[in-house]
UniProtKB/Swiss-Prot annotation:
First-listed, main subcellular location of the protein, grouped into a coarse class: virion
Protein name (record): Putative outer capsid protein p10
Cell location: Virion
UniProt keyword terms in alphabetical order: Capsid protein, Virion
UniProt-listed Pfam families: Fiji_64_capsid
GO terms for cellular component: viral capsid
InterPro entries listed in its UniProt record: S10
Length: 555
């Protein structure tokens, strides 16, 4: 019979995605196997050949390293998420290009006549890249997993890529019947000779330890990202969220903050809409809020509390227009239905309605029969959709960045702005809840947002949802247009970068997944046996086609 032997390269001794499909035994040994050790090993004195040049440029080769060590580094990097680490990502891409004979500027193949063909030249640019990539490797090594794992031996079926599977006796027996008893001998040999802090320690394994069938040979927990699973990857939730934020930039980009509207015709803006807005200004510089003033007269006789003006009965309201030449106020009385309109839509309005109201004492009767307040009202553009009264629109004057106008004329402008914003938002955002979830990943930015710009992440969400008019209603902001541009040009791109990073809370130890899966099968077995009285509840069949493929090479 052909003997079976097993050789494990050091780069395979970690918990994670298998580096070569032919190797199935995965072990842990933290003190010896780290990502940093790969970088250090490449440039040790015994593994390099120095070839200093008198005049060196970026493409000059000053050092030769072993090709085998570069291949192992590339294999190791396949199990590491480097998307947020730029330098190590460049090394990874350069290695991929080099091994596939694509053009790159880091590694150079050396003719056999000059030096051993097992060596590869590294350019000056490449050495600089390696130095920065090592800092990235140190960043990866700082990622620690708090949950310890312990156990016996883990075999990794090829058909379950990225998942460790603890094989119990019933499964081993099934595999043995399919591909022969040599498998059982190999597994038994591995159990007795290799370190064993891997996967989970099951009750069956503990029992085997007591009987002396298995022996733990020490070993350590290898705490690295590959020993965990990112839960958001199930169902492609992370890809979906990233896709949503990529679409966000279709509309929420610098064109809103820096490009005049007349250059956005037939892109964001219809030709008919451009006639109602200022084409020489950017979209964020348009008339998003309108400001107007009223004078309220209250009947003091009905006052209930001495310190609460809201308990007065609102008797009369006049729309107040200041004549800039004479500084005199022109008052338009809102009586009858107009008074009711004011009471229902403005008097008790809240910020959630897109309206901000400031009241100041204007006049108080000597006989204490009435009191008057000067009321300043800020309308966000989207608020006018709720406030409809055509008769009042023509008598109320508002101030906007486009000049002074009646409310009905401003309503026409506001409707266009709201329509464009809604169209852009609908184009960019299909599932707004995912945008909210993505922005919540940037909670660490909250303090800086408040310190620098006096806004919160909730304000950013409301800005996306409602438009710049929302920022105009925030009394804490002195220049809402500037903040709107900063959100578009700086804050949103920063938040999007956070979406690409894995949330530590979403990571779960692979051993936890294995334990829960084993317990699920155990519970279902008990359920089946109790309901049928049968003992054949093993879900593993002896059909070779239904078993995960395990490759074992004979030598």
């Amino acid at each position: 019979m052909t003997s079976i032997s097993l050789t494990i390269a050091p780069d395979l001794i970690h918990c994670g995605v298998p580096q070569r499909l032919s190797d199935t035994i995965i072990l842990n040994d933290k003190p010896k196997i780290t990502l940093l050790s790969y970088f250090d090993n490449i440039f040790t004195e015994a593994n390099i050949i120095k070839a200093p040049k008198e005049h060196s440029v970026q493409s000059t080769v000053n050092i030769y390293v072993k090709l085998e060590l570069l291949k192992r580094l590339y294999d190791r990097l396949q199990s590491v998420d480097t998307s947020t680490l730029p330098y190590i990502s460049q090394i990874k891409e350069a290695l991929r290009s080099f091994l596939h004979n694509d053009i790159q500027y880091v590694f150079t193949r050396i003719p056999d006549s000059e030096i051993d063909g097992n060596y590869v030249g590294v350019t000056t640019h490449g050495l600089s890249l390696f130095a920065n990539a090592k800092n990235d490797a140190e960043e990866i090594e700082r990622v620690q997993i708090d949950t310890p794992t312990e156990g016996n031996l883990t075999l990794k079926p090829i058909s379950a890529d990225g998942v460790e599977v603890v094989l119990d006796d019933s499964y081993i027996n099934a595999v043995s019947k399919v591909i022969g008893p040599d498998v059982h001998k190999l597994i038994d040999k591995c159990c007795k000779e290799f370190p064993a802090h891997v996967g989970t320690i099951l009750e069956e394994v503990k029992y085997c330890l007591i009987l002396g069938k298995l022996r733990l040979a020490g070993g350590y927990d290898y705490n690295c990202p590959s020993s965990t699973t990112d839960v958001t990857r199930y169902g492609d939730f992370d890809k979906f969220r990233i896709k949503m934020f990529n679409k966000l930039t279709r509309f929420y980009n610098v064109s809103l903050a820096l490009v005049p509207c007349n250059k956005l015709k037939m892109q964001y803006i219809f030709d008919s809409e451009s006639e109602k807005i200022n084409g020489d200004r950017t979209f964020l510089d348009q008339a998003w809020p309108a400001i107007t003033s009223f004078i309220e007269t209250h009947d003091l006789a009905t006052k209930v509390k001495t310190d609460d003006p809201d308990t007065y009965v609102l008797k009369e309201v006049k729309s107040c227009k200041i004549n800039s030449s004479t500084k005199q106020a022109t008052l338009v009385n809102l009586d009858g239905n107009k008074l009711e309109w004011y009471k229902n839509n403005i008097y008790n309005a809240k910020l959630e309605d897109g309206i901000v109201i400031n009241r100041e004492l204007y006049e108080k009767a000597a006989d204490k029969s009435y009191i008057k307040y000067n009321v300043k009202v800020v309308f966000a553009s989207y608020a006018l959709q709720k406030i409809i009264d055509e008769k009042s629109d023509k008598s109320i004057t508002v101030d906007t960045s486009a000049g002074e106008m009646t409310l009905d004329k401003y309503r026409a402008i506001a409707n266009v702005l709201n329509s464009i914003w809604k169209r852009g938002k609908d184009m960019a955002i299909k599932y707004f809840d995912y945008i909210k979830m993505g922005i919540e990943k940037a909670t660490h930015l909250s303090l800086n947002l408040m310190k620098k710009y006096n806004i919160t992440l909730d304000d950013v969400v409301s800005f996306i949802e409602k438009g710049p008019g929302y920022l105009a209603t925030l009394q804490k902001l002195n220049d809402y247009k500037l903040i709107a541009k900063i959100i578009i040009c700086h804050i949103l791109p920063t938040i999007i970068q956070c979406v690409y990073k894995s949330d530590p809370n979403s990571k779960i130890m692979n051993s936890t997944l294995i334990t829960n899966a084993v317990n699920l099968i155990r519970q279902d077995t008990k359920r089946y046996e109790s309901s049928t009285g049968r003992k054949d509840a093993n879900l593993v069949t002896h059909d070779a086609s239904s078993l995960p493929l395990i490759r074992i090479y004979k030598t």
